[in-house]
């Protein structure tokens, strides 16, 4: 190997290095998805959407995240009120747009 070959050797492109680093960061963020602030925020948003269409109590919604062998499962249990006789089957509130 002569001196010029030393300076000409192929370096890994910076784009490849950046891509590898980004993949590592994303993998760490995905691993932290079951953090304590994730589920309460998700439950709050789901509750707001459900309340647009059905009058329910806050304590009637349960959100649970389970992880098994590389697979994540989100379980949402909503206890809906009994239907009232003669009530129209339309959303409780509609957005005017």
UniProtKB/Swiss-Prot annotation:
Disulfide bonds: none annotated. InterPro entries: MinE, MinE_sf. The keyword Cell cycle applies. Keywords: Cell cycle, Cell division. The keyword Cell cycle applies. It holds the Pfam family MinE. GO terms for biological process: cell division; regulation of division septum assembly. Prevents the cell division inhibition by proteins MinC and MinD at internal division sites while permitting inhibition at polar sites. This ensures cell division at the proper site by restricting the formation of a division septum at the midpoint of the long axis of the cell. Belongs to the MinE family. This is Cell division topological specificity factor. It comes from Rhodospirillum centenum (strain ATCC 51521 / SW). The gene is minE.
